[in-house]
Amino acid sequence: MEHLANENSDSDIRYSFLSTLDHLPCELIRSLRLMQTIDLFKNEEDEPGMERACRDLLLVATYINDLVDDQIHFLKQHKKELEIQKSVTKNFNSSLENIKSKLTLEEPGAYKEPKLLLKINLKKAKSRERKESITSPTIGINQGDVTEGNNNQEEVYCFCRNVSYGPMVACDNPACPFEWFHYGCVGLKQAPKGKWYCSKDCKEIANQRSKSKRQKRRK
């Protein structure tokens, strides 16, 4: 047990408390033997010796009491530290499980794209009032099959220059060359609130166009 305690003393606060108990039995035994010796002197008829023995006996008893009180205090302190350690370990394990769950969901092949049910020409159907997500699947055709159909002069969008599939979001810049973007390509998981731009350049261009229109109206 001593080997295990020494091996884990740096990693577990429970073993640091055990180290405080190493000398406790020896101290108690030594003090009890001293009390026994003093008690023998107390039984002698020498009155001054009896008084001195009583005083020494009281001192030893007080020392033993303080020794036990100190160990009780150490025990309570280490109990609190152990509870804190358990709480920290529990929170760490919980956070680790959440991270593992997210990593598992984001593994390649873990997410299956929905089948496309309907082809949509997004360049004609694009709305400028509010950008909302849209699922535009093609009947009986998976995403991989649609990629092969790019050679059939289908409309392509997004930075990936692919056809429309799954949830997509439109750039609020009317002059954006890509117009619509797949959620996965721009790091979205749900429809953005308010205006959304695919890049800083698109946002600056849109703001300049809007500013120019306002100036023309004032004139």
From Swiss-Prot:
Provide this UniProt record's keywords sorted from A to Z.
Answer: Metal-binding, Nucleus, Transcription, Transcription regulation, Zinc, Zinc-finger
Which GO MF terms does the UniProt record name?
A: histone H3K4me3 reader activity; methylated histone binding; zinc ion binding
Which amino acids does the record list as binding Zn(2+) 2?
A: C171, C176, C198, C202
List this protein's GO terms for biological process. chromatin organization; chromatin remodeling; DNA-templated transcription; positive regulation of transcription elongation by RNA polymerase II
Paired cysteines (S-S): none
Compartment(s): Nucleus
What positions does the entry give for Zn(2+) 1 binding? C158, C160, H182, C185
SMART domains, A to Z: PHD
- Subunit annotation: Component of the NuA3 histone acetyltransferase (HAT) complex. The NuA3 HAT complex has 2 functionally distinct forms that participate in transcription. The NuA3a HAT complex is composed of at least NTO1, SAS3, TAF14, YNG1 and EAF6. The NuA3b HAT complex contains an additional subunit, PDP3. Interacts with H3K4me3 and to a lesser extent with H3K4me2.
Q: What is this protein called?
A: Protein YNG1
Q: Which organism is it from?
A: Saccharomyces cerevisiae (strain ATCC 204508 / S288c)
Gene that specifies this protein: YNG1
